[in-house]
């Protein structure tokens, strides 16, 4: 049988579709190639439950005789974070004692399958989606696909790793505090955190039900949008569902995206934080230089309303919402929880109803302050994460180091914003030199397509600059840097 190993070097959706149209590849051949890789060792601890060859083949067989052009995701392999339901496959949220086997898929998964996508497995995560490191799982600390000494980021850890390794063209994660963005940044991927409610969270094990979003990992903005378009739709029984309402003119297929004149809010210098990481500080400065070269307008903003909102998420009563999601299970089987998760959720009991209402009042005030900032800008640009860390560093100090990853992400869902993690080249100085660096573009609710257009312009208008996104030192799908 002909080898299709080259697939794993660039698993883009359009490249796959082109091969299907040309007859040089079939979905069944793709499944055979993927099964050969996912059935063996898993040194990155990316998977909780890879699908077997036969399980994947059922989805491939269902595509036989179908029109490729009628199915936007025809034969496209995707991975699913194991807190999202896939019919007939256990959902565990990385807690084996919590496992159940759904009879129907989550609506977002069902829509993707209906569009022709092929699920290939359930991925590892920080237990109950609580964490940004990927290290809080009984299935092993998820390791970075590009350098296994480093953390993958989380909580959608395996979702990012599966795409970075080229096994999946895209994957689904969830994002409450940055879980769909931090792992993307650590792997040079795009991570779309959509507007709350636009992708249904039915069939998703809740973390903070009022804040949870299903997120998308992809190799390109085009791929992320194709998945976003296919997955979107209101589930009638989803109380948190919202119709997608993009601003007028946001989705003009013939328009050429440009950064020229776009007003990017940038936190004041004294509000930027890298926790001593010179690699990330230098990389962000280089990203801002490239935005200026593309004629974007950089507007200094007071970032304090956003930082204060971020502090509410883990220093306020929203931790109690995590407990509410699994209280009955946690009370009955406390020893089934990962020790760090047990510590975090155990602290939720100290928050009273009065504390919660005081926090809601505080959040309303911060939203008002943030709205004033938005009057001057079109989007915010920040590092996606303030720093990165090795697996050993996280094992030594799991809560404090993890919290650093959320400095620029924790505010987004509380303020009802959309966000997109975008690759921004690699670190060129300091101890993280050679590892990917990412920025995040943040916009108002329902401006998801605006963000994707900004990302397209970012790629088109900044790739000629030294150290830019796809220069000779940048990690591409299926590659890794030898940093040893």
Each language-model region and where it sits:
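Gly/Ser-rich catalytic/binding loops embedded in alpha/beta enzyme cores
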Residues: 2-176, 289, 294
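Short helix-loop capping/hinge segments that flank enzyme active sites or metal/cofactor-binding pockets
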Residues: 4, 73-95, 258-267, 317-371, ...
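Serine-dependent amide/ester hydrolase catalytic core
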Residues: 14-21, 36, 268, 272, ...
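Acyltransferase
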Residues: 24-32, 61, 65, 276-301, ...
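Conserved hydrophobic/aromatic pocket- or pore-lining residues that grip, position, or stack substrates
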Residues: 81, 112, 291, 326, ...
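Glycine/threonine-rich flexible loop motifs
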Residues: 90-101, 277-278, 390-400
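Short glycine/serine-rich loop segments
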Residues: 105-231, 413-426, 433-440
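A short helix-breaking turn/cap at a secondary-structure junction
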Residues: 193-282, 305, 461-484
